[in-house]
Amino acid sequence: MEDKNKTIKETLQGSADAGKRKKLIIKKKGDDPSTPSPAASPKKETVAESAPSSKPPVMPLPLPGDSGQSPIVRPAPSSHSPAKREESPGKQDAGRPPRDKDTRQGGGSSYPPSRSPFQKEDSNIIVSRPIQRTGPSRPNSGGGYQGNRGPGQGGGGYQGNRGPGQGGGGYQGNRGPGQGGGGYQGNRGPGQGGGGYQGNRGPGQGGGGYQGNRGPRSGGTGTRPMPITSAEVELSQSRGSSVTSKKKGHDKEKSTSDRDFSGAENTKFFKQKFKKTKVVGVSGVSVPKEITLLENVQVGELAKKMNLKPGDVIGKLMKMGMMVTINNIIDAETAALLADEYGCKVKVVSLYEETIIEEEKDNQEDYINRPPVVTIMGHVDHGKTKLLDTIRRSSVIDTESGGITQHIGAYQVRTARGLITFLDTPGHEAFTSMRARGAKVTDIVVLVVAADDGVMPQTLEAISHAKAAEVPILVAINKIDLPAANPEKIMQELANHGLQSEEWGGETMYAKISARENIGIDKLLEMILLQAEVMDLKANPKRRAKGTIIEAKLDPGRGSVATVLIQNGTLRVGDPFVAGVFSGRVRAMYNDLGQLIQEAGPAFPAQVTGIDGVPDAGAPFDAMADEKEARNISQHRIEFERIGNAGAATGTSSKVTLENMNEFIKQGALKELKVIIKADVRGSAEAIKESLEKLSTPEVKLNVIQSGAGAIVDMDVMLASASNALIIGFHVRANPKTIALAEKEGVQIKYYNIIYQVVDEIKLAMEGLLEPEKIEEVIGTAEIREIFKVSKIGNIAGCMVLSGKIQKSANIRVIGDGVTKFEGKLKSLKRVKDDVNDVVAGFECGIQVDGYNDFKVGDTIEAYNVTVIKRKLE
């Protein structure tokens, strides 16, 4: 090392003797501290192998040892660029041991134009050849050979000269672990980071490799070098250079994707070159392969689900002939057509499927046997509620108006062999939706058929619901104590519908019972428990509750009350929950006897209070971990429901076809009866609405503008007044204040307790809106033979009655050349000179028509009567 230093010193002194350059002084740490330092210390910088740069190539830098190359000429120090500098410990690796002051100073030297100050013919300093030159030459400050440093020191080796404010350049040599970048860095512009070839470093060091030139303050790397040849590697190793030595774990060439593209230009290059390929739509973003939608969806929501801009969706819809905005609502069919253009499929789901609540994980060890849920179904008046009454030993049937079940009743009965939960569904034809819900939440269906009546429409409907829900059916043939009972006939009729009894080689269990006389009830219960045992019904009582809303109503004293069938888990007082589109916290719970309870387990029907609305019957019920989450889900469902209702309303009012265009061309042709329905429970209001809407005809439409549970209030009256509607109260009434307001506004309120009374009276009201049917009967015709002109009276037609008779009270029609010229009434009818009431065929008469004188010989006068017949709804 001393030989190297001596050789460099002699070279520099020889240059000074030539007198062509000022003396170049290279000082080490520890020299005169009074000398100011014009250049900052080189910053340590972690670098990585760079990518190809878009900059134009520059000439390669000559290697040390090459002959015939000119040195870099350094100007003399000026006032603003002193020749001497001191490397401050704070800037040049503080903590580095100071060097001994020696003779490492050289005077200015004059190199031949083809020589570089880095090169000497007998120099042992060898570096690999960089492929491209570094930045342009610039005025340099004092540099020099700094030598090697120990671990923790700054860059060592020959750094070369730097301009004011520049980072370290030149050859830095090797460093120990923890040191900054080493290797040949080359020259850099002012304010730049480390550049040039840095070589390899030990563990913990920054990245090595050839960094090349960078722009001012650029963090990016420069041009990429060509691979180092094996000859250069051998040459470097033979002369003691560690530039090409490999580090452990870094002997593989980095792939393009692993490189550090931190510079501005290279970052842009990376984004353009390595952008991932996606299935894209108009907006250049990925479109999912499948999305889920409700029956109606907002344009903005559709765009969000498809990862498209709203403008793209609106543009597509405009091409499809639909003028929409981001807030407009379209149906799922239209959305599916649009999505198909992007290769996206649409799956239509229900409101509750769109907002799925994440299932809680179950532990199979926690599952226990649960009671069966049994739904009693059948035709109206076949004895379903009486059967349940007998089982419960209570008088439930007496509380129902007209002896007909108005809504689902849920009860739990304790038998000798265990608990059974019963659901009693209505048998009236209006309660189709209730029976369908009952079949979906049940485990077993007991089909009650009267032995003296037979299979009826609601019996067949109940069979269809049970089969659709894949629920086993047990048949109870009731009223076998009556003289007209014929159980064999019932079994034959049911066998024709797929319910063949076990006695006849089938799989359906039959029980012959009499609910009134308590005959065969025990056998029926035994059959139910046997079927439940075969089904092996289980539930986990240790998880959060999950169930179904059986019924809901608005109670004056307790607010919204919902009957919930817990299907899994346990519901406790204080639990937050989501019930349909509403949320709440369990304030109180009651069993089917009205007693307060603290918790309800699987297959238990409980009445729950604390809901912020009246949910729909059949809606899902889910206990939640916290109330905030429950409210969020509720808000999403309410918004989706609003969109769905708005879309449905838009669809019904705008769909006009060629077939019905003539019916709607005149607004007066369509008559409408508007009603508001208020009932004690939500299910009854829903059933009444469904029944009344079936009464609509092309001429008279029934429009239920609002339906719900609860008492009739002032708001209902004001809505009815504004829309000219009738209010129907089912098991509810209005208070005196509301009644007075209704009288003032001229709103009619009708009260009912039995559903078929509602249907019958509304049907009569709608029939009154129908245009009566007019039947025309031609009673006689007469031909005009002569015309008599009377100045004071007008023209009189002399006619011969050809058929029938002409009556003075009849309507007449004047027909000429097959065209009706006039229709009206007779003003006078004379036989010779006498006024008569009618003239029969074969006689002549004189006819004067009120308001018509343009008679012509040969025209026909036709007399007819019109019979008005009141029409009925079909």
Curated annotation (Swiss-Prot):
GO molecular function per UniProt: GTP binding; GTPase activity; translation initiation factor activity
Entry keyword Nucleotidyltransferase: no
Region named G5: 514-516
CDD domains: IF2_eIF5B (cd01887), IF2_mtIF2_II (cd03702), mtIF2_IVc (cd03692)
Residue pairs linked by disulfide bridges in the UniProt entry: none
The keyword GTP-binding appears for this protein: yes
G2: annotated span: 403-407
Pro residues bias (residue ranges): 54-63
Segments of this protein annotated with the region G1: 378-385
InterPro entries hit by this protein: EF-G-like_DII (IPR053905), EFTu-like_2 (IPR004161), IF2_II (IPR044145), IF2_N (IPR006847), P-loop_NTPase (IPR027417), Small_GTP-bd (IPR005225), T_Tr_GTP-bd_dom (IPR000795), TF_IF2_bacterial-like (IPR000178)
Residue ranges of the region described as G4: 478-481
Alphabetic keyword roster: Cytoplasm, GTP-binding, Initiation factor, Nucleotide-binding, Protein biosynthesis
Region of interest (Disordered), residue spans: 1-262
Cellular component, GO annotation: cytosol
Compositionally skewed regions (Polar residues) per UniProt: 235-244
Family in the record: Belongs to the TRAFAC class translation factor GTPase superfamily. Classic translation factor GTPase family. IF-2 subfamily.
Protein task: One of the essential components for the initiation of protein synthesis. Protects formylmethionyl-tRNA from spontaneous hydrolysis and promotes its binding to the 30S ribosomal subunits. Also involved in the hydrolysis of GTP during the formation of the 70S ribosomal complex.
Protein name, per record: Translation initiation factor IF-2
